Amino acid sequence: MELDQDVNRIIKSKTATKVSAMQAEIEANHAYIYDVQLKKLLRLHDEELQERCHTPLRKLYAKYSSRAEGNRDLQTWAEHVERDLRLLETTLRLVREGKAQDTEQAPGKGDRIFRSD
């Protein structure tokens, strides 16, 4: 019972104690840290990030973006060349198959029209 009275007296006390003074100081420090130092830290971090990361990346993009556009043209050109090569390969295969069929058939007068012997 005596302990309860002491606790109630401490809790309901209007006078400042060392603990309440320490708590007030902690709360004031927290407010200062949050309102001033954290905002300052975020601003410094943003400036540092901008300076070390964003700006160099932007410069790299500006430097090499025109080359990347040229590579798109190169890709299109390579696709056309590949298509033409496939067309030539198919044509050669068909010509070889045609020659093989011509040699298997008995030579006749009609066959000589297309041959240049």
From Swiss-Prot:
State any GO CC term. endosome
What subcellular compartments does it reside in? Endosome
Q: One GO biological process from the UniProt record?
A: regulation of protein localization
Chain intervals for the UniProt region annotation (Disordered) = 97-117
Which positions carry the signal peptide feature in this UniProt record? Answer: none
Keywords of this protein's UniProt record, alphabetized? Endosome, Transport
Its quaternary structure?
Answer: Component of the biogenesis of lysosome-related organelles complex-1 (BLOC-1).
Q: Which family does it belong to?
A: Belongs to the BLOC1S1 family.
Q: What does this protein do?
A: Component of the biogenesis of lysosome-related organelles complex-1 (BLOC-1), a complex involved in endosomal cargo sorting.
Q: What is this protein called?
A: Biogenesis of lysosome-related organelles complex 1 subunit BLS1
Q: Which gene encodes it?
A: BLS1
